[in-house]
Amino acid sequence: MRKINGFRAILSPQFRLVRIQGRIQGQAGLRFVEEVWKETGRVDDAFSGMPYDDITAAIDYYFENYNDGRPFIIAAHSQGSAIAQIVLANYFKEHPELNERMIAAYIIGYGVTPEYLEANPHLKFATGEDDTGVLISWNTEGKKSIEENADNVVVLPNSISINPLNWKLDDTYAPASENLGSLVANEKTGEPEIRDIGADAQLVLDRGVVLSNGEFDFDAVPEFLKKIFGPESFHGNDYTFFYNNIKENVAKRVEAYLANQ
């Protein structure tokens, strides 16, 4: 347990990432994820077993020893969000009292689908900027991926996204002027800093992603990952592009939750 970014305490459980033939993550693990995705349309099976067991063991220990009945927020990304969906579907179904204390689950960088929500009626997707007990998700892409309708391992068919600047579910455009600041590396020191990089946001509803049109001075995705994520996926920037807006949104949802207690 640790304190960070103005929050009282953060649990950051460690888990074993996707393995294949004894090699961890890297291109081998990603190829395995891609194979599972092509066979099933989801990558859940790639994360079953040890990763899921690691997470549930950590969650059990946290709620039994540290939580003391307090409300909480879930934040995850990519593989973590895929596992979080499994946890929310299974563990939270077995422990319904936790749903009442969950302020929100930011499970970003892996698609949430209507089929998933229908199969898990105890879960609901966010509809605005301050509803609580909700799931929040998006995947960020550039024009090239969208124009080519490129395969992206984390963008599932029928994915639902919310706009991280205006917190709407429609395709209302949010210009970069609504972005409160992105988290980027300082060009000289390499240290993280908040800067305006021109990251706007608009939902592309038929693909279920957030389109960001900024003129960014870095590659969207490494060359060896383009086969899996597409030519212009901003997967690694799902949080950082909209960093200060997310921080503000967390505060609004906490305030709304506490106001209803």
Residue ranges and their predicted role:
Residues 19-24, 73-74, 104-107, 136-137:
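Structural recognition of the beta-strand scaffold that forms the well-ordered cores
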Residues 29-44:
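Cap/lid segment of the alpha/beta-hydrolase catalytic domain
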Residues 57-68, 90-242, 247-252, 256, ...:
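Surface cap/lid and interfacial helix-loop subdomains adjacent to catalytic sites
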Residues 75-84:
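Gly/Ala-rich beta-loop-alpha elbow adjacent to hydrolase catalytic centers
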